[in-house]
Every structure is written in C-alpha cells, then in structure tokens.
Amino acid sequence: MNDAALPPDVSAALANGLQAQSLDADFAAPLLRYLTLLVRWNKTYNLTAVRDPREMVTRHLLDSLAMQPYIVSGTLADLGTGPGLPGIPLAITRPQLQVTLVESNGKKARFMREALRHLALGNARVAEARAEAVDEPAAYDHLTARALDTLAGIIAVGGHLLRPGGSLLAMKGVYPHEEIAALPAGWRVGEVHPLQVPGLDGERHLVVVHKD
C-alpha cells in the first residue's frame, strides 16, 4: 500500500489536524507513510484494534501529537508504546528528541523497527522488553505512557528510568483525581493540561509528574 491507497479524505483530515495543532504541514508526509505501514501490517498482525485509517488519524496520530508542545528535546522513553504511539509521531515532529520505544510484544517491536527503517528515523530506537527489565537507570529526561497503567503503576515499572528532576507525561481521559492522590512518595504532580484533539470527543488530560 502506498499513500495513495489510503482513503482520499485521510490526507485532508491529517492536514487539518496538523494545522489545528499548529504543526508544520511538512510533517504530513512522514506521518502518512507511518500510517500506511501501520494499516498494512495491522491486517496481518493485529497491532491495534482501530482498523479505519480515518479513525487512526484522530485516535492515534493527532491524539499522540497533542502532547507534543510539552516535550521539546532531551531523551524520552515511551513505555508500552505498542506500534509506536506516541513515540514515533513525537520523533517525527521533534527531531531534536531522542526516543526509545519500549515494547515487549515481538510483533509490535518488529513493526516499529521496520517503520524506523522505512522512515529513516535516526532519533528513535526500539527496546524489545518490558519496562521494568530495561536496565538504563536514570537515563531519561522524560517518560511517556499513553495507555499503560495508572500513574502509580507506570512509576512502579518504569520510574527507575527517569533521572531526578525528570518528568512523566501520562495521557489520561477524565481528570484522574484518585490516581494523583495515590502517587508514591518522591513523585509530585507539576501540571495537568486539558488537551484538545481535533476530531475527538471526550475529555483528554496530560498529567505531568515530576520525580524529586
């Protein structure tokens, strides 16, 4: 499948979404190449439950990119990234960011390696492992997790990867009052940003948790 094989309104939906998120239109081409590869592999390997490319634009690409204003540079570990979400869209739009895509599922890890090769994306790499097994203590400025666990659960499996003073950026739906109240000692919420994802109804919040 090439980009032209995607439904004709997919490109327009992505272009409109990038504009709404104040992102450069030049990012559309690599994002569409990634989407095309994801659609193709998903038919065989079931990488995501979302099947419709139009829905993938909203629920995968634009949702991932909603956190982009809050991560500028440095090192980032994306925990339980699945097929590379949000890590690959962030690596595309933030070339100064060094992204490690942490995923234990072999099919998803193979897909991501092919995607990085296909996109010639030199600022990202795949770590095929569970987050708790990645032996890189205090190596990262940022952690992300889009659909992995509660805040305390994310910290339990991946908190060792974050340097002191670093930040965990966790995507949540409604404001997670109970999860924030259950944070372990040594971790504190810095900010909670309401997110607007073009085309997506429902609440989205980005919770930024700092490691003391």
Curated annotation (Swiss-Prot):
Catalytic activity: guanosine(527) in 16S rRNA + S-adenosyl-L-methionine = N(7)-methylguanosine(527) in 16S rRNA + S-adenosyl-L-homocysteine
InterPro entries reported in the protein's UniProt record: rRNA_ssu_MeTfrase_G, SAM-dependent_MTases_sf
EC number(s) on file: 2.1.1.170
SUPFAM superfamilies: S-adenosyl-L-methionine-dependent methyltransferases
Positions bound to S-adenosyl-L-methionine: G80, L85, A131, E132, R146
Top-level enzyme category: transferase
Location relative to the cell: Cytoplasm
Keyword rRNA processing included in the entry's annotation: yes
Top-level lineage group: Bacteria
Entry keywords, A to Z: Cytoplasm, Methyltransferase, rRNA processing, S-adenosyl-L-methionine, Transferase
Name of the protein described by the UniProt record: Ribosomal RNA small subunit methyltransferase G
